[in-house]
Amino acid sequence: MSNHNEISSFIWNVCDDVLRGLFKQHEYGDVILPFLVLRRLDCVIEPKKDEIIELYNELKEEVDPTPIIKKQTGLKFFNHSNYDLQRLKGDPNGLKVNFPNYISGFSQNVFEILENFQLEKPVEKLLKNNKLYLLIDKFTEIDLHPN
């Protein structure tokens, strides 16, 4: 994981490169915090991502896959969509559809937290101004993996 100074510097660089002029300074946190959380979640899930997708797809028609996925992966949360921030970069033209798919793929315990961020409006603004891809690209550069 990056250290505090690296994370702080990263955040200010993102604000300068992506958010300045598009959002007011007091709105930066409405974008930065949720994307930091998303990146951290992705980094925790990353080693088990393919296993999660496979398990979810195998079980979803028969049972609630949540407890089985949690038990088998040892994680308390997961994302069963085919996307994470890194994979979203592979289809820049599909972000309008794929980003909501990514968000809705989180397990219920995380999805409820993400709903409270009310990301729809900032993401809509980023999409409209062709900045969502740039923001996602920036956030995939920072290492927020657990130590």
Model regions and ranges:
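Non-catalytic, mostly N-terminal accessory regions of nucleic-acid modification and defense proteins
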Residues: M1-N147
